[in-house]
């Protein structure tokens, strides 16, 4: 992506920072997003950071007021091969520990949510934000209806930050209601998804345990 700065009707291309000048550790991205969550994702309400539950520790927990659902946000400062596996694991965590996340919401916001009626668990999603994703992850995000969203973050000179969502199948095709069988995620790994072992005839919006 080319980014320009305008001055007196003239454009100057800004240089993209890389390596240590961009995001040399994940906390830089995490702090940037958490401190500006309502600007970056207006529908998301920040709940907590690095929430430890069931042996896992998601980076950021948020509640989507438009979808009435929870979202986990993960940050990577380098390419990471386990994005899909980690995303599915966190998705399943939210499904298995619904009461714990509703209790967390009550603790942070002082509001009571009914586990079954006030939260749309089908809209649960895991968001990954990173400067880089592998070509396989990008392809998977376009072709498989996973509850995972990928965003590429870039830093340019003069303090310019860009955040680009990688287009998914969900973005280009309306969701349809189906009654297809559930699958067990422990039968599939990220490699299985990328090599085609996983059949996308199944409804990934209702995945069960990894």
Name what the model sees in each region.
Residues 1-210:
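Charged, terminal alpha-helix-loop-beta segments
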């Amino acid at each position: 992506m080319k980014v320009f700065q305008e001055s007196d009707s003239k454009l100057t291309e800004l240089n993209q920072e890389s390596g240590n000048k961009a995001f040399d550790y994940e906390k830089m991205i995490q702090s940037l997003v958490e401190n500006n969550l309502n600007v970056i994702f207006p529908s998301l309400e920040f709940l907590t950071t690095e929430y430890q539950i069931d042996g896992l520790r998601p980076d950021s927990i948020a509640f989507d007021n438009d979808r009435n659902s929870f979202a986990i946000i993960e940050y990577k400062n380098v390419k990471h091969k386990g994005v899909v596996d980690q995303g599915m694991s966190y998705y399943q965590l939210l499904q298995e520990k619904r009461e714990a996340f509703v209790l967390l919401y009550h603790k942070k916001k002082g509001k009571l949510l009914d586990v079954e009626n006030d939260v749309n668990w089908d809209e649960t999603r895991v968001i990954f934000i990173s400067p880089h994703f592998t070509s396989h992850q990008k392809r998977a995000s376009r072709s498989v209806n996973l509850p995972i969203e990928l965003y590429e973050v870039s830093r340019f000179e003069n303090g310019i930050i860009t955040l680009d969502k990688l287009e998914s199948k969900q973005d280009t095709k309306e969701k349809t209601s189906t009654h297809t069988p559930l699958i067990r995620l422990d039968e599939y790994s990220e490699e299985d998804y990328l090599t085609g072992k996983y059949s996308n005839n199944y409804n990934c919006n209702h995945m069960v345990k990894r």
